[in-house]
């Protein structure tokens, strides 16, 4: 396991709220339910370090405790389309295929109703 602290923020603006979780261990290790947290926010900016297992050839990815985007989408799959649209995947490793917005993986993410953040994204609060 990594020896680091994981921090997330709930940001409250005058009109909207944002959940900001740029780096977290697996969702099962968090004492809160990520789907509930997304529903309670206007925006959810969520850790997308890795898209799926096997992204780092030769590395045991179970030793790198970020939730895969595929795991996050599975955890949020029961949310309505309206709630899934609140999710913005952020903090992508250079190996993450979501960095290529034309990749098959990016198409899957968007087809399921989620968003992929890009440089310069601004969300009004």
Stretch-by-stretch model annotation:
Residues 1-4:
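A short catalytic or substrate-binding loop motif that flags glycine-/basic-rich loops and adjacent residues
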Residues 123-125:
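Generic detection of short hydrophobic beta-strand segments and adjacent strand-loop junctions
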Residues 6, 15-17, 24-121:
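Cap/insert and terminal regions of metallo-dependent hydrolase folds
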């Amino acid at each position: 396991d990594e020896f680091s602290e994981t921090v997330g923020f709930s940001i409250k603006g005058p009109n909207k709220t944002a959940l900001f979780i740029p780096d977290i261990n697996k969702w099962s290790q968090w004492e809160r339910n990520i789907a509930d947290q997304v529903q309670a926010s206007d925006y959810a900016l969520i850790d997308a370090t890795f898209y799926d297992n096997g992204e780092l050839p030769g590395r045991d990815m179970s030793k790198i405790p970020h939730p895969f985007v595929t795991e996050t989408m599975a955890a949020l799959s029961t949310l309505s389309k309206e709630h899934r649209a609140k999710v913005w995947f952020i903090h992508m490793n250079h190996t993450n295929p979501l960095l290529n917005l034309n990749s098959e993986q990016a198409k899957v993410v968007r087809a399921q109703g989620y968003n992929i953040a890009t440089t310069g994204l601004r969300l009004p609060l």
